[in-house]
Design a protein with these regions (language model features):
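A generic structural motif
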Residues: 62-66, 116, 266-270
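A general structural signal for short secondary-structure junctions and capping/turn motifs
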Residues: 50-53, 103-105, 123-124, 164-167, ...
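C-terminal edge-of-domain segments
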Residues: 1-31, 149-304
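Short, structured beta-strand-loop surface elements
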Residues: 93-157, 271-275
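Short, well-ordered, mixed-charge alpha-helical segments that flank or form enzyme active sites
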Residues: 70, 121-124, 183-185
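An N-terminal domain-cap segment
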Residues: 3-8, 25-102
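Short, structured patches in soluble enzyme cores that scaffold and shape functional sites
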Residues: 91-93, 115-117, 137, 175-180, ...
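Short, surface-exposed beta-edge/turn micro-motifs
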Residues: 56-59, 84-86, 108-110, 170-173, ...
Length: 304
């Protein structure tokens, strides 16, 4: 069985807090997050945005004149993407978002939804990416309600616009008609057409990623470290920037991200230098069963 090789991810930029530097073994990017090399299998911008919208990343909504009532007061309880690329949100009925949508005339007020993706395992530079969707906020018409409720139920079973308890408000469906979509994350920075986001599928691993990464970190730390130990083999044939880093003793290895294409680790060397490395699966996985087999194969190959 061939041994997997990690892909040290390139970036010539060091952040002002000196927290993360990545190795220039592949295509250099003058600044920003570590990027995969040209030609590597990776999700499109639209797929990455769709994944962020429909999973557990933190969301904030910006509306003209809306007051901030504190964290969690009017965050959407659930959200999904329509085939047209709009975003349907389930929000508290007494929230600024619901009031703005209910009072909307014609095109509705401008609205910006910002999504922040935070690593579920504690690492330096914990924010993994951000997405921004800008457009107009409108109420969901009565003749559209059943359709959007079905879309939400498919992605978020158990959430219902009619749900209410004594200590929490009832919910309202609103829609963000998107005009502009952008993303900046571990894969790169770019834009996506709303229609492309509507046609994309979220990453099948994303829904379980947080618990899987936490499990890898707490229960399989030695195996994760075994993958990082392969960096020495990679560095021997790489450029001087890679060799400079892999010569240092890696003192900490943390699983940073997991998707259908592979596993990304964040490594911290003895001198405090931090860099990322990816281990790609032989083929993209389509669910937890295939993921379990891919991870077993990866660890077995690393063990020799």
């Amino acid at each position: 069985m061939s041994r997997p090789h990690g892909i040290p991810l390139p970036s010539a930029h060091r952040s002002s807090d000196d927290s993360t530097e990545s190795m220039s073994a592949c295509d250099d990017d003058e600044q920003g997050q570590p990027r995969p090399r040209e030609g590597a299998r990776q999700p499109t911008e639209a797929e990455r945005v769709r994944t962020l919208v429909e999973n557990n990343a933190s969301v904030s909504l910006t509306l003209p004149g809306a007051r901030d009532h504190g964290p969690g007061y009017w965050e959407p309880a659930a959200r999904t993407v329509t085939p047209e690329g709009d975003v349907v949100l389930l929000v508290p009925w007494d929230s600024p978002t619901a009031r703005a949508a209910a009072c909307a005339q014609d095109d509705g007020p401008s609205c910006v939804m910002e999504i922040t993706d935070v690593a579920p395992v504690a690492v330096r530079q914990r924010i993994r990416g951000r997405a921004r969707l800008a457009g107009r906020l409108t109420a969901v018409r009565d003749d559209e309600r059943a359709r959007y409720e079905r879309l939400l139920a498919e992605r978020h079973p158990g959430h219902s616009p009619a749900y209410a308890e004594a200590d929490r408000p009832a919910w309202m469906l609103v829609r963000l008609e998107t005009d502009e979509v952008s993303v900046d994350d571990l894969w790169g920075a770019g834009r996506a057409a709303p229609a492309a986001v509507g046609a994309a599928e979220p990453d099948p691993v994303a829904r379980h990623e947080a618990e899987l990464l936490q499990h890898l970190h707490t229960a399989h730390g030695d195996q994760v470290r075994g993958l990082a130990d392969l960096l020495g083999e990679r560095g021997a044939a790489a450029g001087p920037a890679v060799r400079e880093v892999v010569r240092e003793v890696v003192r900490e290895v943390v699983p940073l991200a997991l998707d259908r294409f592979g596993l990304r680790l964040r490594c911290t060397a003895e001198g405090g230098r931090t860099f990322d490395v990816r281990f790609d699966f032989p083929e993209p996985v389509n669910g937890t069963g295939e993921l379990r087999y891919a991870m077993h194969t990866l660890f077995a190959a690393a063990a020799g």
